[in-house]
């Protein structure tokens, strides 16, 4: 079985693997369940200063990452990771969701282009059939943090990463899971009473039918309150 391999293009290579070198993702990296390489875009920069950006045609604030620089960096990435799907974290992109992760994993070879400054030249997106992907309706300083978040989400779905793969079915947003794409129910552990707050008695009853019904109703109520657009099947 092929492993997940990510090639990351960035002007800040020291940001990787970052949090992906720890916890579940870090253990999976050591087990060779996934792998990565990082390409410094500045290695393909122009002049002795290794410039990677320039002023925007048509005016406007901010600098744009140059297509000639990015093109050379992407060509190098494709030589290391052939047939890879290329993703560009961008607020203009398709919103990243749990169901999207399964679509992305159909190709285990991925390239992430981490933009900086005002963004990248549109011709790069057209030339390499780059898919823009958004992690939410807010603006970050660059694509590195979204790339880390997306990879973390992908890695934990790989076989052998979680000790109990069945836990995936009881998580929020899992359309085929226990909560049918809704939000996870409230969670409790020991002690039974903490600062006057008791664990719901149904969870202590040992009646699995009642417990499952309670969990589903909790999920429905929480989803209705916080994310009503997810209620289609609840």
From Swiss-Prot:
S-adenosyl-L-methionine binds at residues 115, 135-140. It catalyses: guanosine(37) in tRNA + S-adenosyl-L-methionine = N(1)-methylguanosine(37) in tRNA + S-adenosyl-L-homocysteine + H(+). InterPro entries: Alpha/beta_knot_MTases, tRNA_m1G_MeTrfase_C_sf, tRNA_m1G_MeTrfase_TrmD, tRNA_m1G_MTases_N, tRNA_MeTrfase_TRMD/TRM10. It is found in: Cytoplasm. The keyword Cytoplasm applies. It is an enzyme of class 2 (transferase). CDD domains: TrmD-like (cd18080). One of its GO terms (cellular component) is cytosol. Its EC number is 2.1.1.228. GO terms for molecular function: tRNA (guanine(37)-N1)-methyltransferase activity. Signal peptide: none annotated. PANTHER family: TRNA (GUANINE-N(1)-)-METHYLTRANSFERASE (PTHR46417:SF1). NCBIfam families: PRK00026.1, trmD. This is tRNA (guanine-N(1)-)-methyltransferase. It comes from Rickettsia akari (strain Hartford). The gene is trmD.
